């Protein structure tokens, strides 16, 4: 074991999964969860590990191509489209992203025969209402975590993602796709709304954008303040996606970089 001290501050940047994990193992988190594991509570912060958010998506709607598809040079997809699931929304909550490889989840691959010369349209919910959590299952630092994203816990998320699937199929039905699509693979044909909802529940997976588990808030579940300082602990800040109170309506890489830049300015200012 190696002990390292800090003369000024410790900046925790382990991400939305491992930042709360380190805090919990160190006794910073919900006392009710720590005590049964034999972990002494340093400070009772109920919000550590709560408020887990991610982008649920369908990976993906798959179509066999009439023509050979080149391998992507540097990225799966070069663009995305944003829509509203309901006209009354103030901003889009849906994203569809075409990709030039047959990128499908294990769940979909197990149910359909995926041809190699195929492409996908990926429906994604970028403003989910469902919230999850993570917590320790043991005090052993090498032990497993319990991670529960609670995808589709809110019926509104189910309906919105079903609308996004329908939107992706509408896109594949446009004239611009006629010279490209040889046949529909996933799904093989149009579905009723009921069947679309069932397809969403069977096929939903993670976009790998976890955020929010050490959120910057102003209520009882706040973990950090407006300057990224962990509540009740001197000399400890967090600078990663875990501090986001709400998931952005896009990929989380750029916002995470912005948080890092903000942290560097705070440190420079003393």
Where are these regions (language model features)?
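FAD-dependent oxidoreductase catalytic-site/capping-region signature
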Residues: 65-69, 76-255, 263-270
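Glycine-rich loop(s) and the adjacent beta-strand/alpha-helix scaffold that form part
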Residues: 1-72, 139
